[in-house]
Design a protein with these regions (language model features):
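Catalytic cores of extracellular degradative/oxidative enzymes
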Residues: 1-52
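C-terminal functional module detector
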Residues: 39-43, 47-53, 58-217
């Protein structure tokens, strides 16, 4: 509940004191267009200089309708050993945008040596996307998006039985830009998941350094 200031009688236009936002909900798993429409709102935050982490979750209330883990958020942590999970490190990594959202494929992005959540200097940089998926999953495109615009894309069919797909591109990065990777397919993953669900995944950004503060709404 927002408290209205006594003197002005006006509440702030927006609350931006949060670290993450849900972009991909299990209810939208059958509609990539619905996910992309929410991504556009996220892009607006990024364009304004707010480094808000994108997340996804299955929103499972009933196992017979919503499979747990579709989609899910992968967060980079120091160790894959669950017994060594450091909750503080996990939370800090999520706050620093070191996360991937996916309903199937696992996609990573690097710009030179920078990883998801890192920052790079402006200039001509090499971006590299790697996508991993099981043999039965359709991965029909891999794409690089720079500040909301597609700047590189490859489309399938990829080699049958292939487990990985790669995309490289040279990007002219300007101050304040951000870059993400997207991968997905058109064939639904039935019967392993409920009918109508295609694979879709995207990364959080790699940011381009800028000497400016976020836009004040």
């Amino acid at each position: 509940r927002e408290r209205i200031p006594d003197l002005t009688g006006r509440a702030p236009w927006a609350r931006l004191d949060f670290d993450a936002i849900e972009i991909f909900n299990g209810d939208d798993a059958v509609s990539v267009a619905a996910v992309e429409s929410v991504m556009k709102d996220w892009y607006a935050f990024l364009d304004a200089g707010y480094r808000i982490t994108a997340t996804g979750n299955s929103d499972s209330h009933r196992a017979i309708f919503h499979e747990p883990g579709l989609p899910r958020t992968y967060v980079k942590v120091p160790s894959d050993d669950v017994s060594k999970l450091d909750q503080r490190a996990f939370i800090e990594s999520l706050r620093k945008n070191r996360a991937i959202v996916s309903s199937g494929p696992f996609v990573t992005l690097r710009i030179d040596e920078a990883f998801i959540g890192d920052s790079v200097a402006p200039g001509l940089r090499r971006a590299r996307v790697e996508v991993s998926a099981p043999r039965w999953m359709d991965i029909s495109f891999v794409e690089i998006v720079q500040k909301g615009k597609s700047v590189a894309r490859i489309e399938a069919p990829f080699e049958p039985m292939a487990l990985t797909a790669e995309l490289e591109a040279m990007l002219d990065l300007r101050p304040g830009d951000w870059v993400i990777a997207i991968a997905g397919g058109t064939k639904e993953m039935d019967p392993l998941y409920r009918r109508g669900v295609p694979p879709y995944a995207f990364t959080n950004p790699i940011f381009v350094e800028a000497d400016r503060r976020p836009v004040n709404p």
